Amino acid sequence: MTKTEKTQIIETLTAEFKASSAIAVCDYKGLTVRQFEALRRAARDNGAKVQVVKNTLAGIALENADAKGLELKETNVFVWSDDQIALSKTIMKFAETSNEKFKVKFGYYEGSVVDAAHIETVSKLPSRDELIGMLLSVWTAPARYFVTALDNLKKQKEEN
């Protein structure tokens, strides 16, 4: 790989990492090509990106993106996305189905280094759409109760 190719990879990764709110670093030793492609498909379906990069290049890109404190050792695959919950759900689900061949090592969520346990906890949260639905339900509840009370009052007056 030439120096210009390395520079291009670093620039691309830096821009991608800066734009994302969640980055996960995982071990993929033992995955078959078919399994790895399944990971890429699952990630793509949830708006995440997956790439295997040399640790030195990824380390430079992460530092350029102000993601400091990550120790990159051994083989790593990087998965990143704007949606922390979708990313966490995708990689944890894949880790469960990969028979110990795919392991989540750590991540970088919203400016801080997180461990695999934190990523697993985030994966158990409701999805973004479910959270929005819950919030809307809470917001509309008072109006719904008010309308129900007025309707009951109307029915009561009609009976009398």
Curated annotation (Swiss-Prot):
Query: What quaternary structure, including any partners, is listed in this protein's UniProt entry?
Result: Part of the ribosomal stalk of the 50S ribosomal subunit. The N-terminus interacts with L11 and the large rRNA to form the base of the stalk. The C-terminus forms an elongated spine to which L12 dimers bind in a sequential fashion forming a multimeric L10(L12)X complex.
Matching entries from InterPro entries are given as: Ribosomal_uL10 (IPR001790), Ribosomal_uL10-like_sf (IPR043141), Ribosomal_uL10_bac (IPR022973), Ribosomal_uL10_bac_type (IPR047865)
Q: A GO term (biological process) for this protein?
A: translation
The record ties this protein, via HAMAP family, to: Ribosomal_uL10
> NCBIfam families given for it?
PRK00099.1-1
UniProt-recorded Gene Ontology molecular function terms: large ribosomal subunit rRNA binding
From the Swiss-Prot or TrEMBL record, give the protein name.
Large ribosomal subunit protein uL10
Q: Which Gene3D superfamilies match?
A: 3.30.70.1730
What organism is the protein native to?
A: Wolinella succinogenes (strain ATCC 29543 / DSM 1740 / CCUG 13145 / JCM 31913 / LMG 7466 / NCTC 11488 / FDC 602W) (Vibrio succinogenes)
Task: Return the PANTHER family for the record.
Answer: 39S RIBOSOMAL PROTEIN L10, MITOCHONDRIAL (PTHR11560)
The record's similarity note reads: Belongs to the universal ribosomal protein uL10 family.
